[in-house]
Amino acid sequence: MASEQERNKAVVRRLVDEVLNGGNLDTVDELYAPKLAAEARAWIAPFLASFPDTRMEIIDLVAERDRVAARFVCSGTHTGEWLGHAPTGRRFERIDEAGFYRIREGRIVESWGVEDTLRRLEQLGLR
């Protein structure tokens, strides 16, 4: 039987594989607590619309008790409006990101993250 930490890491892996890389927004409802699902969709859907070929790669995934910390690199092509910027058609590559999640009963109940938005803007020619 998998430990609580392994089960919690599996939730984050599904978020990356099925939602962020796979574009399956229906999975958001399975992975997030009901009160957070709409909030998650509010940032995921527009991001995937702007960068439909998004690829997140998990570099590190660490779990302790009900918490999971993840380090990612993200790549994608800017084909839709993003942060008020018209599509450039340019790619960004290997942008560093980190996500932190609290998981209860197999669902994300709290999440927050940081990303290198300046580097993404620079690679897209927007800064």
Predicted regions and their residues:
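C-terminal and inter-domain tail/linker signature
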Residues: 1-127
